[in-house]
């Protein structure tokens, strides 16, 4: 996870939150970080005035290998996750991008005939940082999560088709067919991307450590296209051949599993 990568930096004090929650902590003054890494590059830009897009991810279905329903989930997750006797977890769309991206993926799946409404209704909502811990404890049979989360927890997962997993920039127009409303705001599907920035000089080394090491990010389950990092909003490129762990003045504020977010009328 990003928290793991950040924690490998000497002196870093990473703090994990869903991206929307992390942004609100900074915006409200409850946290004053030296660096940020979130699953919404647009949120980073709002807070720092610039951002580097440094990684991608994919939605997956993670499942408990010890669940009696594991074979059914592996055979056909669409049908299995709609069954009332199979417990499913997802995160809160009002608190983190994973939550609304899950709903966007279900919207796309529903357009292909999957029982999306039944799956959504059957899924309980958990904080992002507790989702897979709950699964590991036997609290749910399956959960919608990022690929890097499954890798970090060493859990089996089902790769969704590229048409559903929000991972492929070439399918951006297809993803935008999906839309969900959260808090009165319409969010459209977009490829998943991660953004980072440093807010103080003290945060720059940690930022560079995160953004620079593409191989380590890939090892942790993230995708890193050859052209990344891409810096926006700065004349000079502070990420060239380098990147960060999030480290705060107070405790660091970073999203554990943190696309330019696809919000209409932003």
Predicted regions and their residues:
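Exported/periplasmic ABC-transporter solute-binding proteins
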Residues: 1-7, 20, 65-266
């Amino acid at each position: 996870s990003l928290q793991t990568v950040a924690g490998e930096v000497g002196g870093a004090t990473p703090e994990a939150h869903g991206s929307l929650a992390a942004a609100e902590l900074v915006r409200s003054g409850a946290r004053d970080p030296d660096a940020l890494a979130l699953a919404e590059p647009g949120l980073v830009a709002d807070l720092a005035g610039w951002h580097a897009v440094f990684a991608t991810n994919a939605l997956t279905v993670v499942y408990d290998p010890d669940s009696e329903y594991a074979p059914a989930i592996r055979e056909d997750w669409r049908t299995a996750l709609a069954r009332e006797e199979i417990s499913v977890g997802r995160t809160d769309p009002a608190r983190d991008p994973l939550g609304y991206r899950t709903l966007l993926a279900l919207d796309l799946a529903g357009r292909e005939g999957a029982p999306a409404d039944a799956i959504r209704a059957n899924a309980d909502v958990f904080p992002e940082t507790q989702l897979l811990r709950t699964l590991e404890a036997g609290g749910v049979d399956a959960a919608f999560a990022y690929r890097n989360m499954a890798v970090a927890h060493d859990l089996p997962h089902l790769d969704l088709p590229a048409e559903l997993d929000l991972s492929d920039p070439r399918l951006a127009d297809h993803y935008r067919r999906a839309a969900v409303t959260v808090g009165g705001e319409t969010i459209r599907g977009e490829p998943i991307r991660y953004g980072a920035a440093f807010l103080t000089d003290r945060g720059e080394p940690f930022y560079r450590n995160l953004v620079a090491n593409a191989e380590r990010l890939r090892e942790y389950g993230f995708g890193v296209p050859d052209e990344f990092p891409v810096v926006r909003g700065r004349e000079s490129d502070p990420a060239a051949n380098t990147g960060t762990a999030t480290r705060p003045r107070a405790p660091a504020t970073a999203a554990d599993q943190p696309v330019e977010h696809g919000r209409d009328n932003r």
